[in-house]
């Protein structure tokens, strides 16, 4: 962490010569373990240094301030980075930060806090220092950046239809085969999903709670649609094995973070090395998948007693039935900070909140069906409380849903992360709360996806060999430094690029179901980029029979296919999909045969063919 933050600080804009540094202390204090030494506020950048007593190796030093409106929010804080020793005996260290404060601004420094994690001590210094700006003027934020689209695709394309056809030799068939190759691999505990059969550089030979649930969601959709009795029984067996494996994980005494433990060995015992834990999205996504499986199982004529004994009732059947315990955990822990789905930072995350909300809402109905009315009421109450926190993530100044509601972490100054889009895909509860057509979601999808245009050189290749448009290569977030093996420069990911395709397909479906489109100031940049063939104006409304309605949705569909074509363009003819493709060359990078990549392709294909009204598509894939 220190090394990364140092790199981030070095990459920040240096304090200009015209900036003035205000000194508060020239030497370490005698009566405190932390003290602010100096600060400078210039050109929208806040720089500060502090003396920190060397009480432990694991340290977290945070400076808090109020914004330009003299309000303190979770955004108005910054983590300091180790610079050097500040005393000959190494008992004191000098730490610093250099962060942009645009668009929020700074009014006053409130306090600096030092957590010596390994010894459990917290130290702080109250400041209440009125900040004086010097040097260059604070820039006026231009948010969001308006990009001119490089293409105007429209409607479905035959090449993508052929690539995704329901046959064993298509990419859909290949993806399905490779996905199942990573479930119950030889020697692994039944019900486990290996993230990738990559055992070094990188070592992904583990089962992750979240990833496994997303893969099993695809398996459940196949189960729900299969006509082949042989295939249906196979999927059913795997899903019951998965449920039992989840219960075993819940009860593993070696799990350091208990129910929030994210990662297990293939024998289904907890990984106990250093890791980003807890990850509280996992119990939520597992509950969602298993509730949806339980409902599908009952719809197929399954026994409610079997559902209660092998899926739901964790109190009576703790070794095999995980749903109730997952729901109880989500209800009691949703407000606690946890690590994000990228396993990098601890905060309050939009993705985690949205999947937790869906779990609570689905769980409330399911618990009621199981006769567990007291738990059902509790889940409804907690879902309502969680829902009240979601508006906090919308930043009107940035015109963006923040991926996390907290200070800048790991140098992610843009606050842009594709996890917001993934949150809608995995956590939308079909109740118009942050739906696919929500203006704030559309604005965020536009900002996040276009943010990679200036990051990846491969984005300069905008068409394939036949001249068909390629969608934007999408990574996790623009400041990413994980390169698939180590840290250098981040790359586009297959699953995030295809997630944008699925997002657009599902947006079109939702607009068609609604029968109208209303353009707002917030959503206007989205429409101007992804439906540029219509001269959109804020305040315009298109009804289902209007040509602008039809043209706009055909444009979104065309961009959906363009994003799929981007993934296709960087996929070798063998159909093998890695985690990433190189930001410069476009060659596959990182873990080979990433299970989540195949799940993402299948999920996008299901959304596309549903939009095309291909009612037998999912059944045909399930029966392959």
UniProtKB/Swiss-Prot annotation:
Question: Record's Pfam families?
Answer: Glyco_hydro_15
Q: Which SUPFAM superfamilies match?
A: Six-hairpin glycosidases
Keyword Transferase on entry: no
Q: Choose any GO biological process term that the UniProt entry carries and state it.
A: polysaccharide catabolic process
Q: Where are glycans found on this sequence?
A: 54, 70, 98, 111, 168, 267, 333, 460, 582
**Boundaries of every CBM21 domain copy:** 26-132
Q: What is this protein called?
A: Glucoamylase
Please state the gene responsible for encoding this protein: GAA
């Amino acid at each position: 962490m220190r090394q990364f933050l140092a790199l981030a600080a070095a990459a920040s804009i240096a304090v200009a010569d015209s900036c003035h540094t205000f000194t508060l202390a020239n030497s370490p204090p005698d009566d405190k373990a932390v003290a602010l030494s100096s600060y400078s506020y210039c050109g929208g950048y806040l720089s500060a240094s502090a003396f920190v007593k060397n009480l432990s190796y694991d340290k977290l030093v945070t400076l808090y301030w109020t914004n330009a409106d003299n309000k303190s929010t979770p955004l108005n804080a910054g983590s300091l980075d180790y610079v050097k020793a500040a005393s000959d005996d190494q008992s004191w260290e000098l730490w610093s930060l250099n962060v942009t404060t645009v668009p929020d601004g700074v009014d006053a420094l409130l306090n600096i806090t030092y957590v010596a994690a390994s010894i459990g001590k917290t130290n702080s210094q109250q400041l209440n220092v009125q900040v004086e700006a010097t040097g260059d003027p604070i820039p006026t934020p231009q948010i969001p950046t308006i990009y001119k689209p490089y293409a105007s695709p429209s409607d479905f394309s035959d090449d993508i239809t052929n690539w995704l056809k329901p046959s064993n030799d298509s990419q859909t068939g290949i993806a399905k085969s490779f996905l199942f190759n990573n479930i119950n691999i030889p020697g692994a505990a039944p019900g486990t999903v290996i993230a990738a059969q990559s055992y070094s550089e990188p070592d992904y030979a583990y089962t992750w709670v979240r990833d496994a649930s997303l893969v099993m969601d695809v398996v459940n959709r196949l189960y729900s649609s299969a006509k082949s009795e042989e295939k249906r029984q196979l999927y059913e067996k795997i899903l019951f094995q998965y449920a039992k494996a989840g219960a075993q994980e819940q009860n593993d005494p070696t799990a350091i973070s208990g129910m929030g433990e994210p990662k297990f060995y293939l024998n289904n015992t907890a990984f106990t090395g250093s890791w980003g834990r807890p990850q509280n999205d996992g119990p939520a996504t597992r509950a969602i998948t298993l509730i949806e499986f339980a409902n599908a199982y009952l719809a197929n004529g399954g026994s409610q007693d079997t559902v209660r004994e092998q899926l739901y009732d964790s109190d009576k059947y703790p070794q095999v039935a995980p749903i109730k315990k997952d729901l109880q955990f989500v209800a009691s822990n949703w407000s606690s900070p946890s690590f994000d789905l990228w396993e990098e930072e601890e905060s309050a995350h939009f993705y985690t909140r949205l999947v937790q909300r869906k779990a609570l809402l689905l769980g409330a109905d399911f618990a009621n069906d199981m006769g567990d009315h007291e738990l059902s009421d509790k889940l409804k109450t907690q879902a309502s409380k969680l829902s009240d926190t979601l508006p906090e993530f919308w930043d009107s100044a940035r015109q963006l849903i923040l991926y996390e509601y907290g200070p800048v972490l790991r140098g992610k100054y843009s606050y842009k992360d594709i996890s917001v889009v993934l949150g809608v895909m995995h956590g939308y509860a079909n109740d118009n709360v942050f739906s696919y057509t929500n203006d704030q979601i559309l604005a965020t999808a536009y900002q996040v996806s276009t943010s990679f245009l200036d990051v990846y050189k491969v984005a300069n290749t905008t068409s394939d060999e036949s001249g068909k448009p390629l969608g934007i290569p999408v990574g996790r977030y623009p400041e990413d430094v994980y390169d698939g093996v180590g840290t250098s420069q981040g790359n586009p990911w297959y699953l995030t690029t295809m997630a944008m395709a699925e997002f657009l397909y599902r947006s079109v479906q939702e607009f068609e179901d609604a029968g109208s489109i209303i353009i707002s100031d917030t959503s206007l940049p989205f429409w101007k980029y992804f439906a540029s063939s219509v001269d959109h104006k804020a305040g315009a409304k298109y009804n289902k029979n209007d040509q602008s309605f039809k043209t706009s949705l055909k444009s979104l569909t065309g961009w959906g296919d363009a994003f799929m074509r981007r993934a296709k363009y960087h996929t070798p003819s063998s159909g093998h999909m890695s985690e990433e493709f190189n930001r410069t060359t476009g060659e596959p990078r990182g873990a080979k045969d990433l299970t989540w990549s195949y799940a993402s392709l299948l999920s996008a294909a299901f959304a596309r063919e549903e939009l095309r009204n291909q009612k037998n598509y999912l059944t045909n894939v399930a029966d392959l």
